[in-house]
Amino acid sequence: MNVVNVVPMHLPPPPPRPRGEQHVSVLGREVLAALSPVSEGVYVDATLGAGGHTATILETPGARVIGIDRDERALAIARARLARAGDRVTYVHGEFSEIERHLAALGVPQVDGLLADIGVSSMQLDDPGRGMSFRAEGPLDMRMDSSRGETALELIERLSDEELADLIYRYGEERRSRRVARCIKQAADSGELVTTLDLRRAVVRAVGPARIGGVDPATRTFQALRIAVNGELDQLEALLEAAPRIIAPGGVLAVISFHSLEDRIVKRALREPEVWEPLTKKPVTAGDDEVEGNPRARSAKLRAARRVGGAEALA
């Protein structure tokens, strides 16, 4: 078996997230323009989070929103933020992959628009207790719904070196995945893998520190593990598969993605001219002013399409 030399490294954590990235919804005005909410319209915010996008939709008098999130803490924050909206907002604790079941339980056959802001929120990244980020020490958890499922550490311990390497390559597009996986498994086997910073140290041992001004070397590995722990791509595909059935003709689907794996899935799903009419030829990205105030917006891409045809288009 190939063994990677493990050199003790006492690395400081990366700098804290800039203040401008705290709990800010991205592409808010662009989402509003795409959805074009109408009075008495019903919309789904499939990733409610802190309620930023929903608050924007509610600027339209009479518009109603069904907000879905699997993070109970996020739902509590959104409830407090949107309290003045009263019964114009319905809160659902659950996964958006089960959106048809959620809507059926509410007696809502179809909606006028659906928004999904895919991936981890800045609110989750900024909470060390969630274990999503390498910027601060926290447990190796990474679950969006902390009430169920296995943690990132449990996943690492369950997988073989080869399985972990394949996961990191597939979901993190990390070309040095085998070296990274070996270092991670060595740390786990020796009891040196407990926290997020332990994981970052293991990755740095495998690939070396970041270049000045470069992307942190642990970024791809953390992304891969988070996607796997939460089944993010499977969740997205299930949502997109259901979208034509739950969005009424003339309604709009708007999806914000943050990396190429997500964007490719969305782009492929919208390539059905009998079902979707794209609202823009290319994805919408954030302007310089938004990126300056919220650096997370730099990688955001919004794809939006209008639902065309009726039930016959789905046959």
From Swiss-Prot:
Enzyme Commission designation? 2.1.1.199
Q: Where found?
A: Cytoplasm
Question: Annotated region Disordered: where?
Answer: 1-21, 281-315
Keywords of this entry:
Cytoplasm, Methyltransferase, rRNA processing, S-adenosyl-L-methionine, Transferase
Instruction: Give any Gene Ontology cellular component.
Output: cytoplasm
What are its GO biological-process terms? rRNA base methylation
Major localization listed first in the record, in broad terms: cytoplasm
Give the binding site residues for S-adenosyl-L-methionine. G51, G52, H53, D69, F96, D117, Q124
Record GO terms (molecular function): rRNA (cytosine-N4-)-methyltransferase activity
Report whether S-adenosyl-L-methionine shows up as a keyword of the record: yes
Alphabetized InterPro entries for the sequence: RsmH (IPR002903), SAM-dep_MeTrfase_MraW_recog (IPR023397), SAM-dependent_MTases_sf (IPR029063)
Q: Which reaction does it catalyse?
A: cytidine(1402) in 16S rRNA + S-adenosyl-L-methionine = N(4)-methylcytidine(1402) in 16S rRNA + S-adenosyl-L-homocysteine + H(+)
Q: What class of enzyme is it?
A: transferase
Q: Which domain of life is it from?
A: Bacteria
Role, per record = Specifically methylates the N4 position of cytidine in position 1402 (C1402) of 16S rRNA.
Q: Which PANTHER family match?
A: 12S RRNA N4-METHYLCYTIDINE METHYLTRANSFERASE, S-ADENOSYL-METHYLTRANSFERASE MRAW
NCBIfam families linked: 16S rRNA (cytosine(1402)-N(4))-methyltransferase RsmH (TIGR00006)
Its family remark reads: Belongs to the methyltransferase superfamily. RsmH family.
Q: What is this protein called?
A: Ribosomal RNA small subunit methyltransferase H
**Annotated source species:** Sorangium cellulosum (strain So ce56) (Polyangium cellulosum (strain So ce56))
